[in-house]
Amino acid sequence: MLRPVLAALILYAVSLILSTSTHAQTVSWSNRQWRVTNGGMAGVARGNPENVHIDANGYLHLAITQREGKWTSSELFTTDRLGFGTYQWVVEGDVYAMDPSTVLGLFTYGPTAHIGVDAENEIDIEFSQWGNTCGDCNADFTVYPSTGHRVKEGKSAWEDNFHVTGGNVTTARMEWSSTRITFTLMKGTQPIGSTANVIKTETYESTTENIPQVPLPVGINLWCFKKTPSKDQTVIIRSFEYTAK
């Protein structure tokens, strides 16, 4: 017969296994494996795997919502690292007019795989009004420097904050090489290589010090900047594609 304390410990361990297995920590989507996180994302609303799911069409759903009285957000990363090439997401939802505190990030990021420190090895396409702190901006393109070249106070090597309008479906693309990154937003669903219905495009050219040089995980997150939203937020990512250069 098991002693009461030992029996209690076993029951507790079983309950943990059951609770963590009810929602996948790793998902298969767009022909890649993705690790769903419970990251802090600026500390306002932690990620919760229950906020990430894939529907019958194969679309990825992300949410910011309250669970057990606390606001929670969404974040996932590829389990592999990708290098120079073309990265493309098709996004469904009016990402140009979300709650001002909401941020949708489409990015590559090094620290999640222990590549350098924060504010290095990161390339971002972000949709956000940043709590109305950037004039009338609702999106940005941002590049952080390569390993060992962190800018003072963790600032980016380059960024462009801007205001644009688009439809309910947006194709977001970045083309990354050792000395050049081209960012493009397009209305509707566009194939890789197309430049139809361009909303915004910008190219950053610089030295290898200012542009990441190593393969990085790909991340997608929906999170809160400094405060929580006035109501639940949802975004759908229809697809992600990558073509190596």
Residue ranges and their predicted role:
Residues 1-9:
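Bacterial N-terminal signal peptides that target proteins for export
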Residues 8-17:
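Bacterial N-terminal signal peptides
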Residues 117, 162-164, 180-242:
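Aromatic sugar-binding interfaces of carbohydrate-active proteins
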Residues 18-24:
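Bacterial Sec-dependent signal peptides at the C-terminal "C-region" and cleavage site
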Residues 87-89, 168-176, 181-185:
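Short tryptophan-centered beta-strand motifs in secreted/extracellular beta-sheet-rich domains
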Residues 73-80, 156-163, 208:
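Beta-strand-rich interaction surfaces with strong enrichment in secreted/lumenal proteins
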Residues 24-114, 121-131, 141-143, 197-201, ...:
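Low-complexity, Ser/Thr/Pro/Gly-rich disordered linker/stalk regions
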Residues 114-169, 225:
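Glycine-aromatic-enriched beta-strand/loop faces of beta-sandwich-type recognition domains
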